[in-house]
């Protein structure tokens, strides 16, 4: 499938990349973006301002992943939420997806997202979250995303 503009950015918050294992996880996450059948428009890597991780990332060749990638220094808090919020505030696309540095997308993730958002134009937010309910009393048990995440590897929407 030829790549087209998806109008989606990936926001990838990174607090630190210490040790070979974390660098490998980051590379796997970025490779999963680059290996998409339909690529997102850009990746925004958000790091704490003035951090060592900024230096580490600027020394890496981020062009090898095949997606426009920008490193943003978050001038405020260094927690996950503030990094996500800052990244979202810098998006130039209508849609965004949050990728943690130790997670990966299936190769058809964005292809399926584009199909889904095109088929459901009245929806403003897509969240791969399932609310687990106790069948006996209908009470809240928790939130999960594993079933939705695993379904992204399926050909079904």
Q: Which role fits each region the language model picked out?
A:
Residues 96:
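Short aromatic/hydrophobic "clamp" motif used to bind/position activated sugar donors
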Residues 74-91:
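Glycine-rich, basic loop-to-helix element that forms the pyrophosphate-binding segment
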Residues 110-143:
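Conserved donor NDP-sugar-binding/catalytic core segment of glycosyltransferases
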Residues 40-50, 70-74:
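Short beta-strand/loop segment that forms part of the nucleotide-sugar
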Residues 129, 143-157:
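Short, flexible, basic/aromatic active-site loop/helix in glycosyltransferases
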Residues 100-104:
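The conserved acidic donor/metal-binding loop of glycosyltransferases
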Residues 6-11, 42:
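Cell-envelope/extracellular polymer assembly enzymes that use nucleotide-activated donors
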């Amino acid at each position: 499938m030829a790549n087209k503009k998806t109008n989606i950015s990936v926001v990838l918050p990174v607090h630190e990349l210490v040790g070979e294992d974390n660098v490998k996880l980051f590379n796997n996450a970025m490779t999963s973006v680059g290996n998409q059948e339909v690529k997102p428009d850009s990746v925004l890597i958000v790091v704490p301002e003035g951090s060592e991780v900024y230096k580490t990332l600027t020394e890496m060749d981020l062009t090898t992943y095949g997606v426009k990638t920008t490193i943003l220094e978050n001038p405020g808090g260094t927690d996950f939420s503030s990094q996500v919020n800052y990244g979202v505030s810098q998006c130039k696309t209508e849609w965004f997806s949050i990728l943690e540095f130790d997670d990966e997308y299936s190769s058809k993730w964005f292809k399926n997202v584009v199909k889904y958002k095109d088929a459901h134009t009245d929806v403003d937010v897509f969240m791969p979250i399932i609310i687990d309910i106790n069948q006996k009393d209908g009470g809240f048990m928790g939130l999960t995303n594993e079933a939705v995440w695993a379904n992204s590897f399926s050909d079904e929407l």
